[in-house]
Amino acid sequence: MMLGMPLVLRIAPILFALVLWPHDSAAQNSAAGARSGRIEPPAATQGAAVPEIIRDLSRLPPRTARTRERILDAARAGDLEKLLIVMQMNETVPVFSFGSEKDPIALWKAIYPASDGLEILAILIQVLETGFVHVHKGTPQEMYVWPYFAHVPLKQLTAEQKVELFRLATGSDYKKMKEFGAYIFYRVGIAPDGVWHFFVAGD
């Protein structure tokens, strides 16, 4: 498997920064979390309806589909600078860390020094090639999120879906996610208007 490094080591800088993350009201946290890619604690989502897993790309709004393709084009080119340009062309720079980092390329190179940061592009491709979900419909936080694991309880995954998960994470990663109660590896969120809101890992 390409992603042999344990999950904790791969996202350690991001997880460390969570200690400093400010806490506002529940409503503010919910809205901000949806836009930033934060994973809600398992207890907060108990009883919530599980969104439909979508694989048909034709169901994406045109602007969402175009943004996804621009991201994939940059990632497949193996060019971090090209991906940065896509981020900068966005309405707002997508959330790429829950910490205070200002330079995504510097962060990715620090997390994946062996590949000089390029491993993040492979992860991004894998994430955007999985099924996705359409969440927070009809609200300002409406979003298309990849991979669907971010909004589907791990205990409900079929064997086939677990194999798909293992393309992104190791068995050890999966065990840690089960202990936490949710998928906490990289995910992408793009709004119906094509705005790319986040590409983050962590909870």
Segments predicted by a language model, with ranges:
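Bacterial N-terminal signal peptides that target proteins for export
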Residues: M1-A12
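Boundary at the C-terminal end of the N-terminal hydrophobic targeting segment
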Residues: S25-N29
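C-terminal-biased regions
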Residues: A31-E69, E81-D203
